[in-house]
C-alpha cells in the first residue's frame, strides 16, 4: 500500500447522541478506534443571557441564573445575589443564610446524583439512573414547596430569600436526610467495586494537578487530581465557616476518582444539611428571612394594606427596581460543577452595566481535546460524563 493512502476517519458525535448530554456536537478524528483530535462545537443553546441581564433590573435578572446549570438552579442564583449584596454593602439575616446553604447543598446532591447515575448509564448500567431520579424527584418537591417551582425556583433574593420555610418542610427534609445515605450506599455497592464500571473508568481521562490548574479547572476536576481546593473551605461565604465537613480529594485524577469524590460529596452535603436544620431550629436561627430595608426588599402584603409608604415602596421596587452603587465585584461560589463566578459591574443605575458569568463547564469542555486524545472512541462518553457538563451554562 503506498504511503499516504491511510486517511483518518472523521465522525460527528451528537448533537442528538444520548451520551452527548444535551446539545453538544463533537467532531472526532479517528485513527481506527483511537481518537486523534476532538473538536467541540458549542453555541447550540446560546440565548444571550449576559446581554439580556443588562436590560433587566437586579430583581428581574435572578431567574436567568436558574436557566444556566438547570440541574442545580439555586447555586447560581446564590452567586448573583452575593455579588449584588457585596456592591450594596448589606448583610443577610442569619436565618436566610442558613436556608440558602441548605438549598445549595440540595442542589449539589441533585447535580451529583444526576451525574453519577448518568455516567453509569453511559457505560451501560441501567439501574442507577432509575434510583437516582427517584431521589431527585423528592428533592425537587422540596424545591417546589419552598418556591412553587420544581426547577426554575427564583427563590433567592438580594437581601435574603423569598419566604420562610414551613416547619413541616424542614422536618421532611430531615427525614429525607436520614434515609438518603442508604441510597448512596446502594449505589456504592452497585458501582464502586463493579468490574465493568472500573474497566471503563479507571485510568481514563487522567488529569495531573499542574494540568488542571493550567486549563482553569475547578471543583471536582481539581480535587480529583489531589488539591483540596473547595471555595466553601478556602474562601468561606455565608455561614459555611460554621459548618463541619470534609473535602474529599482523589489521587489519580481519572474518571473513577472523580466518581468516588462525587459519591463522598453527597454524604458530606447530607451532613451540612443536617447541621443547617439543627441551626434553623436553634433560638439564634429564628428571625427574618430577608432584609428589613424596604428600599431593597418589598414589604409584606399585610403591611401594604395598612401603610401608604409600604405601598409606594412596593410600587417603586416592581416598576423601577433599586439602584446599586457604582462599582465592580467578582464573587465565586462552589457550585456542584466547580467555581461558578459572577463579575458584576454597576454604573449606579437600577440595571447591571455588565454581568460576566464564569461557568465551570466551559473551562472543562475546552480541555476535551487534551483529555480525550489517545483514548478509544468508547471512552469519549465516559470522559464527557466525568467532566459533568451542562449546556445551559456553557452556551448561556
UniProtKB/Swiss-Prot annotation:
Its EC number is 7.1.1.-. The keyword Repeat does not apply. Signal peptide: none annotated. It catalyses: a quinone + NADH + 5 H(+)(in) = a quinol + NAD(+) + 4 H(+)(out). It is a peripheral membrane protein. PROSITE patterns: COMPLEX1_49K. It is found in: Cell inner membrane. It holds the Pfam family Complex1_49kDa. It comes from the Bacteria. One of its GO terms (molecular function) is quinone binding. GO terms for cellular component: plasma membrane. The keyword Coiled coil does not apply. Gene3D superfamilies: Cytochrome-c3 Hydrogenase, chain B. InterPro entries: NADH_Q_OxRdtase_suD (IPR001135), NADH_UbQ_OxRdtase_49kDa_CS (IPR014029), NDH1_su_D/H (IPR022885), NiFe-Hase_large (IPR029014). Keywords: Cell inner membrane, Cell membrane, Membrane, NAD, Quinone, Translocase, Transport, Ubiquinone. Coiled coil: none annotated. NDH-1 is composed of 14 different subunits. Subunits NuoB, C, D, E, F, and G constitute the peripheral sector of the complex. Belongs to the complex I 49 kDa subunit family. NDH-1 shuttles electrons from NADH, via FMN and iron-sulfur (Fe-S) centers, to quinones in the respiratory chain. The immediate electron acceptor for the enzyme in this species is believed to be ubiquinone. Couples the redox reaction to proton translocation (for every two electrons transferred, four hydrogen ions are translocated across the cytoplasmic membrane), and thus conserves the redox energy in a proton gradient. This is NADH-quinone oxidoreductase subunit D. The gene is nuoD.
Amino acid at each position: 500500500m503506498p504511503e499516504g493512502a491511510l486517511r483518518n476517519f472523521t465522525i460527528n458525535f451528537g448533537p442528538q447522541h444520548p451520551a452527548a448530554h444535551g446539545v453538544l456536537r463533537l467532531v472526532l478524528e479517528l485513527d481506527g478506534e483511537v481518537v486523534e483530535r476532538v473538536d467541540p462545537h458549542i453555541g447550540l443553546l446560546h440565548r444571550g443571557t449576559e446581554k439580556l441581564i443588562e436590560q433587566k433590573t437586579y430583581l428581574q435578572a435572578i431567574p436567568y441564573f436558574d436557566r444556566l446549570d438547570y440541574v442545580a438552579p439555586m447555586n447560581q442564583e446564590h452567586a448573583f445575589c452575593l455579588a449584588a449584596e457585596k456592591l450594596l454593602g448589606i448583610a443577610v439575616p442569619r436565618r436566610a443564610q442558613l436556608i440558602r446553604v441548605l438549598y445549595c447543598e440540595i442542589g449539589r446532591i441533585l447535580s451529583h446524583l444526576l451525574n453519577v447515575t448518568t455516567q453509569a448509564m453511559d457505560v451501560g448500567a441501567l439501574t442507577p439512573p432509575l434510583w437516582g431520579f427517584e431521589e431527585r424527584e423528592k428533592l425537587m418537591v422540596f424545591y417546589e414547596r419552598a418556591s412553587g417551582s420544581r426547577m426554575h425556583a427564583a427563590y433567592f433574593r438580594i437581601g435574603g430569600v423569598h419566604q420562610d420555610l414551613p416547619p413541616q418542610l424542614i422536618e421532611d427534609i430531615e427525614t429525607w436526610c436520614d434515609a438518603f445515605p442508604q441510597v448512596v450506599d446502594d449505589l456504592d455497592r452497585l458501582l464502586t467495586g463493579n468490574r465493568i464500571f472500573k474497566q471503563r473508568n479507571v485510568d481514563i481521562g487522567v488529569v495531573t494537578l499542574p494540568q488542571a490548574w493550567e486549563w482553569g479547572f475547578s471543583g471536582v476536576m481539581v480535587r480529583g487530581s489531589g488539591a483540596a481546593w473547595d471555595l466553601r473551605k478556602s474562601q468561606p461565604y455565608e455561614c459555611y465557616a460554621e459548618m463541619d465537613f470534609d473535602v474529599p480529594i482523589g489521587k489519580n485524577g481519572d474518571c473513577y476518582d472523580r466518581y468516588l469524590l462525587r459519591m463522598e460529596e453527597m454524604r458530606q452535603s447530607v451532613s451540612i444539611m443536617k447541621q443547617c436544620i439543627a441551626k434553623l431550629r436553634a433560638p439564634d436561627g429564628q428571625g427574618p428571612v430577608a432584609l428589613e430595608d424596604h428600599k431593597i426588599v418589598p414589604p409584606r402584603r399585610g403591611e401594604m394594606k395598612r401603610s401608604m409608604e409600604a405601598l409606594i415602596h412596593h410600587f417603586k421596587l416592581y416598576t423601577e427596581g433599586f439602584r446599586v452603587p457604582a462599582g465592580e465585584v467578582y464573587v465565586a461560589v462552589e457550585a456542584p460543577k466547580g467555581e461558578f463566578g459572577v463579575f458584576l459591574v454597576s454604573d449606579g443605575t437600577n440595571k447591571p452595566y455588565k454581568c460576566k458569568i464564569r461557568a465551570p463547564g466551559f473551562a472543562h469542555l475546552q480541555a476535551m481535546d487534551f483529555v480525550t486524545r489517545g483514548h478509544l472512541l468508547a471512552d469519549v462518553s465516559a470522559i464527557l460524563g466525568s467532566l459533568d457538563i451542562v449546556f445551559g451554562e456553557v452556551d448561556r
